[in-house]
């Protein structure tokens, strides 16, 4: 799959933008704060109906206007798809795929797939478990609508369970009904996460080996608060029952997929605690490029690769690995200079110069 064309209107610092993209490498060059990342952000938004930079949609609208528009034409093996999104300042949005209105965000997932790599992705390794869970959830949602459905249901039931825990009229029988529903969704979520981690380990072994010239081994380990061998549902239900007194005191559910994490080990060393910044960056790179392989395995097409100002952050080995993968994947790169890229561009590649919301091919 690849993006054939993009149109933006009143989106951040773009009043009107229309671009035809190459199905190969597309490079957006310019100084900082000129609008390069805004292009990548708009593509990401069309995949997930959310920005990777802000939780407030109104930030995406040009400050002089009340609404912004994004339109993408995506070429796929079987059928081209057009995605149109209108973003309103009151927080509402209207999404259409091939002129058909999308009523639920989950219906948008999988229309096309993206993998983004940016300097902020170091947070996946360095910061809280919630960021690592978000990484897993976002990757799984775009390849599995069933995962998205179970995740939404789980969070809904979890919130309702927490209300019951805090209620003065606490009813244990009602709580048990919610627990059984929670366990069903959790079972699917954890199994899918474990399978995804297994796939990252499979592909990541080869990717990390190539980046480090065989000097390091990397392992990803899912860390669940529920210890189980075969029957996750039984183990989770028992944990909920055993933790009931504490959960009542705190007014929250203290265990479940919403509290899980995963650890990254390089040569058996916890990268978050003891890894160098270079090792942490390599771990993120391994995760992202493993995701490329996983999406290709499941959908039979490579996703679009978005590289947001990351080349300047990479040493020569990491940079060489990234650039060597671009031949089969539509890649959209932002950078301040083209020197590192010249050997990897061909006749299909396009270079765009960006200056204050204006783009010249």
Swiss-Prot record:
ATP binds at residues 30-37. GO terms for molecular function: ATP binding; single-stranded DNA binding. This is DNA replication and repair protein RecF. It is found in: Cytoplasm. Belongs to the RecF family. Its main location: cytoplasm. One of its GO terms (biological process) is DNA synthesis involved in DNA repair. The RecF protein is involved in DNA metabolism; it is required for DNA replication and normal SOS inducibility. RecF binds preferentially to single-stranded, linear DNA. It also seems to bind ATP. It comes from the Bacteria. The keyword Lipoprotein does not apply. The keyword Ligase does not apply. SUPFAM superfamilies: P-loop containing nucleoside triphosphate hydrolases (SSF52540). HAMAP family: RecF. The gene is recF. Signal peptide: none annotated. Keywords: ATP-binding, Cytoplasm, DNA damage, DNA repair, DNA replication, DNA-binding, Nucleotide-binding, SOS response. One of its GO terms (cellular component) is cytoplasm.
């Amino acid at each position: 799959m690849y993006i054939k064309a993009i149109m933006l209107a009143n989106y951040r610092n773009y009043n009107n933008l229309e671009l035809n993209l190459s199905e190969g490498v597309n490079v957006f060059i310019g100084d900082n704060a000129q609008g390069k990342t805004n292009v990548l952000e708009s593509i990401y938004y069309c995949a997930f109906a959310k920005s990777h930079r802000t939780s407030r949609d109104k930030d995406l609208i040009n400050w002089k206007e009340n609404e912004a528009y994004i339109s993408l034409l995506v070429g796929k093996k079987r059928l081209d798809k057009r995605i149109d999104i209108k973003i309103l300042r009151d927080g509402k949005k209207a999404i259409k795929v091939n002129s058909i209105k999308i009523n639920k965000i989950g219906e948008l997932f999988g229309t096309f797939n993206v993998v983004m790599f940016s300097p902020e992705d170091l947070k996946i390794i360095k910061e809280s478990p919630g960021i690592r869970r978000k990484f897993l959830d976002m990757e799984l949602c775009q390849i599995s609508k069933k995962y998205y459905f179970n995740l939404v249901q789980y969070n809904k039931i979890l919130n309702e369970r927490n209300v019951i825990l805090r209620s003065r009229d606490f009813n244990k029988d009602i709580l048990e009904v919610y627990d059984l529903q929670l366990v069903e969704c959790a079972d699917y979520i954890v199994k899918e996460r474990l399978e995804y981690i297994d796939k990252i380990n499979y592909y990541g072994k080869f990717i990390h080996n190539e980046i480090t010239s065989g000097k390091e081994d990397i392992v990803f380990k899912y860390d669940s608060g529920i210890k189980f061998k075969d029957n996750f549902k039984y183990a989770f239900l028992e944990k909920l029952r055993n933790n009931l007194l504490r959960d009542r005191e705190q007014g929250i559910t203290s265990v479940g997929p919403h509290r899980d994490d995963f650890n990254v080990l390089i040569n058996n060393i916890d990268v978050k605690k003891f890894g160098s910044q270079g090792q942490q960056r390599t771990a993120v790179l391994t995760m992202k490029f493993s995701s490329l392989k996983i999406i290709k395995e499941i959908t039979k097409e490579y996703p679009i690769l978005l590289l947001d100002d990351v080349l300047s952050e990479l040493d020569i080995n990491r940079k060489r690995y990234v650039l060597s993968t671009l031949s089969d994947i539509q890649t959209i790169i932002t950078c301040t200079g083209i020197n590192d890229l010249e050997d990897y561009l061909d006749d299909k590649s396009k270079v765009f110069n960006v200056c204050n919301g204006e783009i010249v091919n």
